[in-house]
Design a protein with these regions (language model features):
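HIT superfamily nucleotide-processing domains
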Residues: 1-299
Length: 299
């Protein structure tokens, strides 16, 4: 029997639209205990937290970018609900919501799903984001991502699409080919602060961006994660985002040995490729609002 945590009912029909269950093989557990003994050379903590699976559709052969817009909106709304719920649990310092597509990127199940993990510490990547924002913000008094977003929109060369509330872009220092960030225009440190209108806009843009990636590279494996401030953190200069990282090239010895990524393609070329890649037959484009921004589709 599945440990069902939450369900979104299917609009107008029996059954469910999204379902959240406990992970059968959790990386963390609420009753985890710390290892016995103390070794100052090897610091450890209990793997105490929560690990859930968000089932994105009742249909086994569905895929997130090819779902209709109402279903993708249900999915993103469920992301938000579980992110907020787990953020309120005692001892949680950060919530990591991610999705793997393809076995090469770590997907162990074919059925469309995402995962959400609440952890008792701030992950290193988030620590680096917070530190960078604080360092830049101390000099200017402004959010560096907000300033960067304004420059990107003015230049346009790395922008994939602009919607009402978000910008999809390939970042200047993209770590992998066709890496894409979906960044809210409104400054906010936490995904928890997103409103209903923003969630619907994010859902539509996420579907279109994944469809562009699929058309450009033939359905490559990828992972995406929501990079956001944790509950109660002082991250006034952090700006949350959804980061899509395609698994198109294999890291070699230099990357593994140095921790420095090598990206063989330019972000400008990748952004142009994604703008030009649009498989119009695979999305319910008639229900999407494409009237704003670059890379638009008219129906």
């Amino acid at each position: 029997m599945l440990g069902i945590v939450a369900e979104t009912p299917s609009g107008g029909t029996p059954g469910w639209s999204t379902r959240t269950v406990l992970n059968k093989f959790p990386a963390l557990a609420p009753d985890a205990v710390a290892p016995q003994g103390h070794d100052p050379m090897h610091e450890t903590i209990a793997a105490k937290g929560f690990h859930e699976v968000i089932v994105e559709s009742p249909f086994h052969d569905a895929d997130l970018p090819t779902l209709d817009i109402a279903q993708i909106t249900d999915v993103v709304t469920t992301y938000h609900q579980r992110f907020c719920a787990l953020s309120k649990r005692p001892g949680v310092e950060a919530v990591v919501l991610f999705r793997n597509h393809g076995t090469r990127s770590g997907a162990s199940l074919v059925h469309p799903h995402a995962q959400v993990v609440a952890v008792p510490l701030v992950p290193p990547r988030l620590q680096a984001m917070v530190a960078w924002g604080a360092r830049q913000g101390a000099q200017t008094g402004k959010c560096p991502t907000c300033e960067e977003l304004a420059r990107e929109l003015q230049a346009g060369v790395r922008v994939v699409e602009e919607s009402a509330d978000f910008v999809a872009l390939v970042p200047f220092a993209a770590e992998v080919p066709c890496e894409a960030w979906l960044v809210p225009k409104r400054h906010s440190a936490s995904f928890a602060d997103a409103c209903e209108t923003e969630l619907a806009d994010l859902a539509a843009l996420l579907g279109r961006t994944l469809q562009r990636l699929k058309a450009a590279h033939g359905d490559p494996p990828y992972s995406f994660a929501i990079e956001s401030a944790g509950p109660g953190s002082d991250a006034r200069y952090l700006h949350w985002r959804l980061r899509i990282a395609p698994d198109i090239v294999n890291p070699g010895g230099f990357e593994r040995g140095s921790g420095m990524p090598i990206n063989p393609s330019s972000p400008e070329a990748d952004a142009a490729l994604l703008r030009a890649s649009w498989d119009i037959g695979s999305l319910d484009v008639g229900s999407l609002d494409h009237d704003s921004g670059r890379g638009e589709v008219k129906t």
